[in-house]
């Protein structure tokens, strides 16, 4: 049994030495022939990742600037639209005031014209009435002169002429 254990331990030791030597040779071969290519690939990959991160940060910064610019433009647009609305309201108020003042002037003119027409018609009516009264007075006086009337006939004649005057 002791021989089996020594054999097994020498086989394990031999295998260990062989694997370790193979591994060391493999590392040396990789180091000599492929190490620069492998590290170059890793460096290239690291540079690409760093560049991608930098580009992403730049795009993020540009996007944040664009968002801020759009927000500023939106605020400016709102301010301008409020100013336009306020100006339109002010112009509308001024136009309303002007129209009302113009309407008042026209109304005053129409009132004055109507008043003048009323006064003219009143004067015309008074003149017509004066002419009619004068004609009636002359007619009545001529009748009184032509007829010698007693008191009763005189009253009847005046009443008839007053009735005639009321009909006109």
From Swiss-Prot:
An example Gene Ontology molecular-function term: proton-transporting ATPase activity, rotational mechanism
Q: What is its main location?
A: membrane
**Keyword Membrane belongs to the record:** yes
Q: Which residues form a coiled coil?
A: none
Q: Where are the transmembrane segments?
A: 10-30
The terms describing its cellular component in GO are:
plasma membrane; proton-transporting ATP synthase complex
**Lineage top rank: taxon:** Bacteria
Q: Which InterPro entries match?
A: ATP_synth_B-like_membr_sf (IPR028987), ATP_synth_b/b'su_bac/chlpt (IPR002146), ATP_synth_F0_bsu_bac (IPR005864), ATP_synthase_B_chain (IPR050059)
Bilayer topology term: Single-pass membrane protein
Q: Per UniProt, which keywords does this protein have?
A: ATP synthesis, Cell membrane, CF(0), Hydrogen ion transport, Ion transport, Membrane, Transmembrane, Transmembrane helix, Transport
Q: Where does it localize?
A: Cell membrane
Q: How does it assemble?
A: F-type ATPases have 2 components, F(1) - the catalytic core - and F(0) - the membrane proton channel. F(1) has five subunits: alpha(3), beta(3), gamma(1), delta(1), epsilon(1). F(0) has three main subunits: a(1), b(2) and c(10-14). The alpha and beta chains form an alternating ring which encloses part of the gamma chain. F(1) is attached to F(0) by a central stalk formed by the gamma and epsilon chains, while a peripheral stalk is formed by the delta and b chains.
Q: What does this protein do?
A: F(1)F(0) ATP synthase produces ATP from ADP in the presence of a proton or sodium gradient. F-type ATPases consist of two structural domains, F(1) containing the extramembraneous catalytic core and F(0) containing the membrane proton channel, linked together by a central stalk and a peripheral stalk. During catalysis, ATP synthesis in the catalytic domain of F(1) is coupled via a rotary mechanism of the central stalk subunits to proton translocation. Component of the F(0) channel, it forms part of the peripheral stalk, linking F(1) to F(0).
Mind telling me which PANTHER family this protein's record contains? ATP SYNTHASE SUBUNIT B, ATP SYNTHASE SUBUNIT B', CHLOROPLASTIC
Matching HAMAP family: ATP_synth_b_bprime (MF_01398)
Q: Which family does it belong to?
A: Belongs to the ATPase B chain family.
State the NCBIfam families in the record: ATP_synt_b
Under what name is this protein listed? ATP synthase subunit b
Q: Which organism is it from?
A: Streptococcus suis (strain 05ZYH33)
Ranked from the top, the taxonomy reads: Bacteria, Bacillati, Bacillota, Bacilli, Lactobacillales
Which gene is the coding source of this polypeptide chain? atpF
